[in-house]
Design a protein with these regions (language model features):
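A short Gly-Trp-Pro
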Residues: 2-137
Length: 137
């Protein structure tokens, strides 16, 4: 699967770290490093037919459905779509091949669900901190 996405507004909505229970579960880690883009700005270059979806609401704080799209070949979580914000795709920073973007345009600007942040994980320097979900991704 190969995607093309924006690295600035208006298509790039946000870059953030999430400490919620669902992100911990889906990443098998203590947090998820994410960025969100508008559907209208995300392009599937190839492999869209190689995606499989899994949806659930059990571990989502809002109780709303979250659909996860995985690569059938390697199992990588390519993006997520939430029922609360269906026009936005939530992507994982770690899926981006250009490591320079991790430190620049995709560097997390916000942290959400910091009330659930593990005690041995430090805040992202300079990132806005939110106890729970920020109103806008």
């Amino acid at each position: 699967v190969q995607l093309s996405f924006p690295t600035q507004e208006p298509g790039l909505v946000s870059t953030f770290v999430c400490h919620c229970a669902d992100c911990r579960k889906i990443t098998a880690s203590m947090f998820a490093s994410n960025f969100s883009v508008l559907d209208t700005h995300l392009t599937h270059i190839r492999g869209q037919d190689n995606l499989t979806a899994f949806a659930q609401s059990k571990t989502i704080a809002s109780g709303k459905m979250m659909t996860n799209y995985f690569c059938k070949t390697c199992g990588t979580l390519m993006y997520r779509v939430g029922e609360r914000f269906p026009q936005v795709k939530i992507m994982r920073i770690g899926t981006v091949d250009d490591f320079n973007l991790h430190e620049t345009k995709l560097r997390p600007r916000r942290e959400i669900y910091v009330k659930d942040r593990c005690g041995w994980v430090s805040a992202v320097e300079g990132a806005e901190q939110y106890e729970a979900q920020r109103p806008k991704l």
